[in-house]
Amino acid sequence: MALSWLQRVELALFAAAFLCGAVAAAAMTRTQGSFSGRCPLYGVATLNGSSLALSRPSAPSLCYFVAGASGLLALYCLLLLLFWIYSSCIEDSHRGAIGLRIALAISAIAVFLVLVSACILRFGTRSLCNSIISLNTTISCSEAQKIPWTPPGTALQFYSNLHNAETSSWVNLVLWCVVLVLQVVQWKSEATPYRPLERGDPEWSSETDALVGSRLSHS
């Protein structure tokens, strides 16, 4: 059975969500790796001579959550894409009511996780940048990437990576919201399927009586 146009749009959105999730997870992992495993989100920077240092990082689990949530959702999108491609080519591509309800629940959870991750990235990056700018060594976080950090090699392109992760997360949130809306539309359309009138239905009897009555009146 061929995929419906709603399912095709949904698969295209899943492909885009996979890319966004993969970019966010990779950018967050690179950022944490550049700080030797410490999480810079909501961190506090200090001056160490002429260089910067991350004196008070956040708990590593905070960055693990952002990278893990983005990575798991990207993996889910990839597996779902492969499953639907296989189903459309080999088996029946129709999704039952139970499968649609499960997909709705997963999409709702995904919207929540991506929203939380995007907010953590937004406010965590802003807190770190405010800490850096308050030292009066630079006027922006992007310029702070050019300043040496202690230990050497720390914070390589940290702001660019955090910005990419945040942007990808917000785009991912929009994609998941659209996916959720499409799935709700499919669920409602399958919940009230079209059924032609049959003998014995109240509507059939009323329409038949009206037609017979009008013919008798004309005769």
Swiss-Prot record:
Keywords: Membrane, Phosphoprotein, Transmembrane, Transmembrane helix. The lineage of its organism: Eukaryota, Metazoa, Chordata, Craniata, Vertebrata. Residues 198-219 are annotated as: Disordered. It is a multi-pass membrane protein. The gene is TMEM179B. Belongs to the TMEM179 family. This is Transmembrane protein 179B. The chain crosses the membrane at residues 9-29, 65-85, 96-116, 167-187. One of its GO terms (cellular component) is nucleolus. It is found in: Membrane. InterPro entries: TMEM179B. The modification Phosphoserine is found at S206, S214.
